[in-house]
């Protein structure tokens, strides 16, 4: 029970930190007249639908609807950005997946998956993914 409580406290701390950090960035954008904010979220912020369910655009983002600290922090930040957009901030959100590129240094989840696959420890791989440089360039257009 104590370990679970610590994990939940840690998770709450992460979500609170993300909320404060992103709220400050959004406040800065509004106060300084930033022309356009492009927030790079993640597919992990999108709640998973039950297997066999048709995928549709999601408009509700909440830490309670996703699993894992990273997903929860991205869902919270995405909700904050979308709320700021409703209040007048010119903002867009993109949801990349499987990005890999220069500077990864073998610590990212996609790199680890590829290394496991090449070492014969993973019998299959996820199709798709995008180069980080291509993703960044498309977000700026």
Question: What residues fall within each predicted segment?
Answer:
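Substrate-access "cap/lid" subdomains that shape
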Residues: 94-111, 127
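A conserved pocket-lining segment of Rossmann-fold NAD(P)-dependent short-chain dehydrogenase/reductase
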Residues: 7, 61-65, 112-137, 141
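Conserved beta-loop-beta element that borders a ligand/cofactor-binding pocket
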Residues: 41, 78-102
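Conserved catalytic Lys-bearing alpha helix of Rossmann-like short-chain dehydrogenase/reductases
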Residues: 18-25, 73-81
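Short, flexible, mixed-charge acidic loops at enzyme active sites
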Residues: 49-57, 107-116
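Conserved Rossmann-fold NAD(P)-dependent oxidoreductase catalytic core, especially the SDR/UDP-sugar
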Residues: 13, 20-70, 92
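NAD(P)H-binding glycine-rich loop region in Rossmannoid oxidoreductase-like domains
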Residues: 1-20
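The catalytic Tyr-centered alpha-helix of NAD(P)H-dependent dehydrogenases
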Residues: 14, 69-73, 131-134
């Amino acid at each position: 029970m104590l370990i679970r409580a610590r994990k939940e406290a840690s998770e709450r701390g992460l979500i609170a930190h993300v909320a404060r950090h992103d709220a400050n960035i959004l406040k800065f954008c509004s106060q300084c007249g930033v022309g356009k904010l492009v927030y790079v979220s993640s597919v992990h912020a999108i709640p998973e639908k039950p297997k066999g369910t048709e995928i549709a655009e999601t408009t509700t983002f909440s830490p309670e609807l996703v699993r894992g600290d990273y997903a929860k922090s991205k869902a919270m930040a995405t909700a904050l950005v979308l709320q700021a957009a409703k209040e007048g901030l010119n903002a867009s959100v993109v949801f990349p997946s499987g990005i890999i590129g220069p500077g990864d240094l073998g610590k990212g989840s996609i790199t680890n998956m590829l290394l496991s696959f090449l070492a014969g420890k993973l019998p299959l791989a996820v199709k798709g993914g995008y180069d980080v440089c291509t993703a960044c360039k498309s977000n700026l257009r």
